[in-house]
């Protein structure tokens, strides 16, 4: 599967969907990983570290969304990203859909498969992705 890691566009969002160590594991599992140029800069991760981990660095979000089956983000897509989402593309991010009916409708209309981190539940009922990302 081709997995895309776009640069976050939300103001003051410096995290990135996957760190280089995660890219290594994905590549070792047979996936191709595309990382948007500069995606990790806000987290202190440069493009070279992603390249060394096995990712291909691409210039822009259009290429990430255009080539990837799975998009891994931190925050919900904004208006500029919504128009890039393709039918049956998997979007994995904190979506906060209860607070944003417009985004919910836009994702439904795009016919993507949207997975909200905050709704992933363990068998014991815990919500592990509501912990700090440092623990995940």
What are these regions (language model features)?
Residues 134-136:
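Conserved small/polar residues in nucleotide/adenosyl-binding loops
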Residues 2-110:
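An N-terminal-biased, well-structured beta-alpha scaffold segment characteristic
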Residues 108-123:
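Acidic-glycine-rich active-site phosphate/pyrophosphate-binding loop
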């Amino acid at each position: 599967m081709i997995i895309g890691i776009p640069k976050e566009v939300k103001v003051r969002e410096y995290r990135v969907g996957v760190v280089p160590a995660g890219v290594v594991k994905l590549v070792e599992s047979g996936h191709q990983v595309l990382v948007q140029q500069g995606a990790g800069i806000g987290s202190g991760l440069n493009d070279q570290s992603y390249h060394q981990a096995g990712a291909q660095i691409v210039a822009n979000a259009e290429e990430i969304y255009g080539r990837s089956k799975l998009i891994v983000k931190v925050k919900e897509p904004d208006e500029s990203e919504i128009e890039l989402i393709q039918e049956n593309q998997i979007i994995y991010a904190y979506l906060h859909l209860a607070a944003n009916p417009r985004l919910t409708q836009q994702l439904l209309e795009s016919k993507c498969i949207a997975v909200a981190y905050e709704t992933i539940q363990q068998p014991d009922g815990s919500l592990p992705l509501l912990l700090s990302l440092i623990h995940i």
